[in-house]
Amino acid sequence: EKGIVCDYFGIDINPGMIAAAKEKFPENKDKFFVFDILEEQMTETFDYVISVGPLNLKFETDQNMDFTMRLMKEMVRLTIVGAAISMTSSFTRRPNEETFYYNPAVVLSETAKFCTNIKIDHTYLPHDFTIFCYKRNLYNFIR
């Protein structure tokens, strides 16, 4: 749509999500896989690894933050340039019981334990934010 050319590879632990992706993008159906990156070892690397919205539902036990940080660490391991995860923000004005809300300051603090080149964007929706973790210093990367 915007003329951006990329080679896309999609994974999800939910077979229904993979089936929906294959149906929506039949020309790329061979690039969508059911896979759990926290349980299975992935050997491929990617320029960017992006996760959008999978961490918004509350777990039955209070493990959202632990799971999220394990996922982010693994995403960073698989990336060459950087990783990004979008999350629901604790700064929302309309919380509900089913959603887990992440405090951006806590996510930043936890991410800083394994990534020093971090950016948070909390400007695009009132209840979401994305944390970006880059492998290299952004100042040197842009130059």
Predicted ranges, named:
Residues 47-65:
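A short SAM/SAH-binding and catalytic strip from SAM-dependent methyltransferases
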Residues 1-40:
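Class I SAM-dependent methyltransferase SAM/SAH-binding core
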